[in-house]
Regions:
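Structural/interface elements that position substrates and couple domains in central-metabolism enzymes
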Residues: 1-457
Length: 457
């Protein structure tokens, strides 16, 4: 997310120097490449590259030129569930060797509470004069696929500062959004905020800001696990989870967002943030059992879907399956903790032959699902579905929601669709002759024709 922040800050009128220790990545960015799939990011980088934003592997030079230094390195989950802060420590140690005058060091990475104090101690350990720095927490609340829009049109900007001097630096940085001036400039990305309704900035303590990030992601993960648990009950009593979620979402106290039943959450944030938040609570002697249940339900949901596939096909050995989707959600190429990848692994171990297609994530998927005798990749979704015994919907890409059902029916061997994302209306699937299995809805929809469409060669 550091690259997104850099592009957006430059669009707000700031000069930004991006630092990465991967020189090949730096060269790629300098040459006009974009290493991640993210809407609007290529356009912003093209607009500001060489003017508002530059790229280097020289951290000391970048720190010397900057008033604020944003840390946006990864904090992966360790074996205990705790966030691994080794990358943070490494970059802070390097920053420390480059500080000669006052700098604001900004935590942008998702970190556990008291990391602010820990960074301060690391800087002290390296001999940095306390009057030469402040450490501020400024958590990001970005969704992959809409990260640029989320940054420029935020629900809130949280600044955890220990004094007014450092808080004022962050206020000035975000002033184009909080004053509304950004939204009046030519070429500004349209969205929820405007000159009349600018972004809101909340100043808190560093500890509060750090917990706001973890608690926010944990609560969103809770909503996802809750609706999936309700979906499993709804399916058992012939109710429809889509109607249930709609009815719940109309309550202004609940709201409709994150009430989508499916395969559970994945990606680089929710899994590790829920685990890290639970670990923090345990370290403080707090029994946060609710977070254990959130994780348990999420893990179970993948097994529930696998069992749906097994139930629909009786046996998986030798079956041809089309897997539509590899990314953990639509509009991204991120496969980290992707339910789709986990489910495909299970299918391969069960002896199924899987042909996968994803609009953006196939190259990344090949790193963890290398081509093999029973694992192939297709150029489009209809090619993936050719002669399939069943089509599995694993990622909620818009392309899949707009599929030509008649064309799909002609491509498959058996008209069976097992939808882990509830992209289709059951009545429409029945009309097109599919056996349709989804999440949290009645299993009564059967194909009008259940025989093979063509002999297998």
């Amino acid at each position: 997310m550091g690259l997104v922040a850099a592009a957006c800050f430059s669009d707000m009128g700031h000069k930004v120097v991006c630092v990465d220790n991967d020189e090949a990545r730096v060269r790629l960015l300098c040459d006009g490449g974009v290493p991640i799939f993210e809407a609007h990011l290529p356009e912003l980088l093209a607009r500001h590259r060489g003017r508002g934003v530059s790229f280097t592997a020289n951290l000391a030079e970048a720190v010397e030129k900057s008033e604020a230094v944003f840390i946006a390195v990864g904090t992966p989950q360790g074996d205990s569930g705790a966030a691994d802060l080794s990358y943070v420590e490494a970059v802070v140690s390097e920053i420390a060797r480059s500080i000669t005058k006052y700098k604001v060091i900004v935590e942008k990475s998702t970190v556990p509470v008291y990391t602010n104090d820990w960074i301060r101690r690391v800087l002290h350990r390296h001999g940095v004069d306390p009057k030469h720095f402040d450490v501020v927490s400024n958590p990001e609340f970005l969704r992959e696929g809409t990260a640029v829009a989320d940054f420029l049109h935020p629900d809130r900007i949280v600044v955890g500062a220990g004094n007014e001097r450092s808080a004022e630096v962050l206020r000035r940085i975000y002033e184009p959004l909080t004053s509304g001036s950004y939204y009046s400039q030519k070429g500004a990305l349209p969205g929820a905020c405007s000159h009349e309704h600018p972004a809101c900035l909340l100043v808190t303590s560093a500890q509060s800001a750090e917990i706001i990030k973890h608690a926010s992601n944990a609560f969103l993960a809770l909503k996802i696990s809750f609706i999936n648990a309700v979906a499993n009950l709804a399916e058992d009593v012939d109710a429809d989870i889509e109607d249930i979620a709609a009815g719940m979402g109309l309550d202004s106290r609940i709201g409709p967002r994150f009430l989508r039943a499916g395969l559970g959450y994945g990606g680089s944030c929710f899994p590790k943030d829920v685990a890290a938040f639970h670990w923090v609570a345990q370290q403080r002697g707090i029994d946060f059992h609710l977070l254990q249940e959130v994780r348990k339900i999420n893990d179970t949901q993948r097994e529930v879907f696998f069992n749906k596939v097994l139930s629909a096909l009786w046996t998986l050995r030798g079956k041809r399956l089309a897997a539509l989707g590899l990314a953990f959600k639509g509009d991204t190429d991120d496969i980290r903790e992707s339910p789709a990848i986990d489910i495909i692994h299970k299918l391969l171990r069960a002896g199924a032959n899987v042909t996968a297609y994803d609009p953006a994530a196939m190259e990344r998927a090949k790193e963890v699902l290398p081509p093999a005798e029973n694992m192939r990749y297709a150029g489009d979704l209809y090619q993936a579905a050719k002669d399939a015994d069943a089509v599995l919907i694993l990622t909620d890409w818009k392309e899949f929601a707009k599929i030509d059902l008649a064309k799909l029916n002609r491509a498959v061997r058996f008209p069976i669709v097992i939808d882990g994302r509830n992209l289709y209306k059951p009545e429409e699937m029945q009309k097109h002759g599919f056996t349709y299995v989804s999440v949290g809805r009645s299993a009564k929809y059967q194909a009008l024709e259940g025989k093979p469409r063509k002999a297998r060669t």
